[in-house]
């Protein structure tokens, strides 16, 4: 895993996940659980402290890699977002690209990256 981190192979068996982290059969743009962000993180600044997300995973971050920090978690404590201190690496477990047509606030993630590469 990137920068030396590792994963739970099954968040339900290994991490005690209780939220719905697999979207099926719910439509892709409909949120299935909430995420809470860490104050001061980029995700917190752009999307707020708490928001609803879609979900398509059964694996999850166990230990983030070097220089990465957990900045978002679901209510069952599954990692939903990580960031590097310099703000150039941001990772999320949800799929904002599938939600932004119905939930335009998720476009802010893509706008942030577009500004970084200018």
Residue spans for each PLM region:
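Hydrophobic, aromatic-enriched interface-forming segments
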Residues: 1-3
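Amide-donor transfer/coupling interface in amidating biosynthetic enzymes
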Residues: 12-118
């Amino acid at each position: 895993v990137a920068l030396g981190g590792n994963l739970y192979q099954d968040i339900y068996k290994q991490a005690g996940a209780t939220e719905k982290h697999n979207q099926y059969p719910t439509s892709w743009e409909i949120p299935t659980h909430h995420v809470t962000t860490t104050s001061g993180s980029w995700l917190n600044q752009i999307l707020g402290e708490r928001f609803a997300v879609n979900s398509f995973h059964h694996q999850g971050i166990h230990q983030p890699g070097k220089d990465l920090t957990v900045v978002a978690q679901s209510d069952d404590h599954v990692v939903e977002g990580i960031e590097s201190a310099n703000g150039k690496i941001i990772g999320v477990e949800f799929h904002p690209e599938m939600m932004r047509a119905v939930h335009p606030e998720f476009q802010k993630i893509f706008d942030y990256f577009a500004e970084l590469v200018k």
